[in-house]
């Protein structure tokens, strides 16, 4: 019975329900009276305090929900600020002078400490966060370009090594082919001047025959009859011919410097007597 009264009391004090007009008001007043009688007749005061605790809990929950609602408002405001900041970042356009100055500063220092960042932002009429973001983007672009250059260099090295490997593989295949074909061929010896026995016999037999024929021709030739006036010339020429094999002139000048073996003038021959 007490549970029924408590249920009725909780339904009677529902704050979320809008107030009704007309005859409904009398029914709610009767329910309130029944709930008050139940609370006064209850032997346990804690049971009577339950709806109050419930309402206090609702109140605390409401108070807790209020800060939560405030936090939601703050989060919404923060999101709107971020949106505003994002739109401001998107709308940021640097002039040529600002870009040139930032580039020069980046060449000097790729990173900035807080003091340098503040000074640069003040000098360029920018916010420190904008300067920091610009430097971050510039470092990323530099790193990307360097990576592309390194990738291109490594690609060329890889192509060179691939070509070299292909050439070495071809040479290795040729050497293996020569090694397998080699036993079917015999190594030719080095060129020498050796002669076969038959050629040696022919050469040895032809040499004495040549010498004997030369001697026979020299003995078979009759000596020429010397003239009366040229006896001295013949003797001198024969002496020169005999000495020629032993003393040959070594040059053209020595040939003409050697003594002549013929007379400078020929002796006149005797005229035959004429008939009178």
From Swiss-Prot:
A GO CC annotation given for this chain: nucleus
Polar residues biased stretches: 39-48
Alphabetic keyword roster: DNA-binding, Homeobox, Nucleus, Transcription, Transcription regulation
The organism of origin for this protein: Oryza sativa subsp. indica
Sequence segments annotated as region (Disordered): 1-92, 214-244
A Gene Ontology molecular function term of the record: DNA-binding transcription factor activity, RNA polymerase II-specific
Superkingdom classification of source: Eukaryota
Name of the protein: Homeobox-leucine zipper protein HOX11
Chief location: nucleus
Tissue expression remark: Expressed in stems, leaf sheaths and blades and panicles.
Segments of this protein annotated with the region Leucine-zipper: 145-189
Gene name as annotated: HOX11
Entry's family note: Belongs to the HD-ZIP homeobox family. Class II subfamily.
Gly residues biased stretches: 58-73
SMART domains referenced in this protein's UniProt entry, alphabetically: HALZ, HOX
């Amino acid at each position: 019975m007490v549970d029924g009264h408590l249920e009725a009391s909780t339904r009677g004090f529902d704050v979320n329900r809008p107030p009704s007009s007309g005859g409904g008001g009398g029914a709610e007043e009767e329910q309130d009276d029944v709930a008050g009688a139940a609370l006064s007749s209850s032997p346990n005061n804690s049971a009577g305090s339950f709806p109050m605790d419930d309402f206090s809990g609702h109140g605390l929950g409401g108070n807790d929900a209020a800060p939560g609602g405030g936090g939601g408002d703050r989060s919404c405001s923060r999101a709107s600020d971020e949106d505003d900041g994002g739109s401001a970042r998107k709308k940021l356009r640097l002039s040529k002078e600002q870009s040139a100055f930032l580039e020069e500063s980046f060449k000097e220092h790729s990173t900035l400490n807080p003091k340098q960042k503040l000074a640069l932002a003040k000098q360029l009429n920018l916010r420190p966060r904008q300067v920091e973001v610009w430097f971050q983007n510039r470092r990323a672009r530099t790193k990307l370009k360097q990576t592309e250059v390194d990738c291109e260099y490594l690609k060329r090295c890889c192509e060179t090594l691939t070509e070299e490997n292909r050439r070495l593989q071809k040479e290795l295949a040729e050497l293996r082919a020569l090694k397998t074909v080699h036993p079917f061929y015999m190594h030719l010896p080095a060129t020498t001047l050796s002669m076969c026995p038959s050629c040696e016999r022919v050469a040895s037999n032809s040499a004495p025959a040549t010498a004997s024929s030369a001697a026979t021709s020299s003995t078979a030739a009759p000596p020429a009859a010397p003239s009366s006036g040229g006896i001295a010339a013949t003797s001198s020429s024969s002496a020169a011919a005999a000495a020629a094999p032993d003393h040959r002139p070594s040059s053209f000048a020595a040939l003409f410097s050697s003594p002549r073996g013929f007379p400078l003038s020929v002796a006149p021959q005797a005229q035959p007597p004429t008939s009178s």
